[in-house]
UniProtKB/Swiss-Prot annotation:
Pfam families: HisG (PF01634). Belongs to the ATP phosphoribosyltransferase family. Short subfamily. This is ATP phosphoribosyltransferase. Transmembrane segments: none annotated. The lineage of its organism: Bacteria, Pseudomonadati, Thermodesulfobacteriota, Desulfuromonadia, Geobacterales. The gene is hisG.
Length: 212
């Protein structure tokens, strides 16, 4: 429906924070928080549509125009490298993309001497670029969850993963070594939609900007 604005949002805490933020600018989408298996919601009165998708898929839905807008972590954008407009840092969902290793290794390790190291991560593209810029060769193992397990069972020496409080790392005997990036959620926009629906999208962007 060309007169609708479609927004792709992932489940979880990002969804809750997004709904709260939209409410501040008069966009009512609290239905998204209901206990349902629905993936698409429509508000006919406000001409808004919402898609609930995996966080890693948000940039793809926006890039291909299935969604006009999306809300997603900067980590996902860095890894995906899609051709998108990124007008706003929404200032929520803060965490850090970190290099970590076992505590016993960190006590005697010298990161400046690293070379040919094996790293497990959900972010192979970001990780490879980070270490290439430092002139360090790495062997990357892509995992999709429980990254902290990799050093414990000998799959990798180190990991690159998102860290919020650091408690999960500590419980698994891992220490933070280097910060690759500080991460927050971003508003992203399909480039064609920004032109064809410029007035409505600009109004949303301006409204959000006043509340972050």
């Amino acid at each position: 429906m060309p007169d609708f604005i479609t927004i792709a949002i992932p489940k979880g805490r990002i969804l809750q924070d997004s709904v709260a933020l939209f409410k501040k600018i008069g966009i009512d989408c609290e239905e998204l928080l209901s206990d349902t298996r629905k993936l698409v919601f429509e508000n006919q009165e406000q001409k808004m549509r919402y898609m609930i998708v995996r966080a890693t898929d948000v940039p793809t839905y926006v890039e291909y125009g299935c969604a006009d807008l999306g809300i997603v972590g900067k980590d996902t954008l860095m890894e995906a490298e899609k051709d998108l407009y990124e007008p706003l840092d929404l200032k929520f969902g803060y965490c850090r993309l970190m290099v970590a290793e076992p505590v016993e290794l960190s006590s005697k390790d010298d990161p400046s001497a690293w070379n040919n190291i094996r790293i497990a991560t959900k972010y192979p593209n970001v990780t490879e670029k980070y270490f290439a810029a430092k002139g360090i060769q790495v062997e990357l193992i892509k995992l999709y969850g429980s990254i902290e397990l990799a050093p414990l069972v000998g799959l990798s020496e180190r990991i690159v993963d998102l860290v919020s409080t650091g408690e999960t790392l500590k419980q698994n005997g891992l220490a933070e070594i280097e910060t690759i990036a500080e991460i927050t959620c971003r508003l992203i926009v399909n480039r064609a939609s920004m032109k064809t629906k410029h007035e409505r999208i600009s109004k949303i962007i301006e409204g959000l900007e006043q509340h972050i």
